[in-house]
Design a protein with these regions (language model features):
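N-terminal intrinsically disordered, cationic/polar leader segments
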Residues: 1-51, 81, 86-122, 126, ...
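Alpha-helical segments in soluble extracytoplasmic regions
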Residues: 53-69
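Short, mixed-charge, low-aromatic patches
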Residues: 48-56, 73-76
């Protein structure tokens, strides 16, 4: 046991948390689709209890969209990706803002949800191009 404690350490480096197969923009897309569906249900229901629950769930799902996008932005994409796709930073910034308080988290706008899904689709296309490389 002591030999292990005092053994020289070995430094290791990893490209990402685990092999890159764990990353997928589909997670953000599924949550964004849920947000859009909830917005539609909100518009069709006047029950205050239902609306309260729906808003809470919509806000939680919007946070999950941001989380999944941030993981891709900070853990999967690396400097060579940003060099090849210089629009990536802007896409992620715009998408996370659309999922935030000024977008689907704070408002119930189908237009915001559609814009968010479009940004996620753009990110997804780039993601899959990088996976092919």
């Amino acid at each position: 046991m002591f030999a292990r404690l005092f053994a020289p350490t070995v430094e290791v480096h990893a490209h990402c948390d685990l092999p890159c197969g764990v990353y997928d923009p589909a997670q953000a897309r599924i949550e964004a689709e849920s947000v859009k569906a909830i917005i539609g249900k909100l518009a069709d229901n006047d029950d205050p209890d239902f609306r309260t629950r729906a808003v809470i769930i919509k806000e939680q799902r919007s946070e999950l969209v941001k989380h999944h996008l941030w993981v891709l932005w900070t853990d999967y994409f690396k400097p060579p990706h940003f060099e090849k796709y210089p629009q990536l930073h802007t896409l992620f910034n715009e998408a996370t803002k659309l999922a935030g308080a000024a977008g689907t988290k704070g408002k119930s706008s189908v237009d915001d949800a559609d814009q968010l899904l479009a940004k996620i689709e753009e990110i997804s296309k780039i993601f899959w191009e990088t996976k092919q490389a």
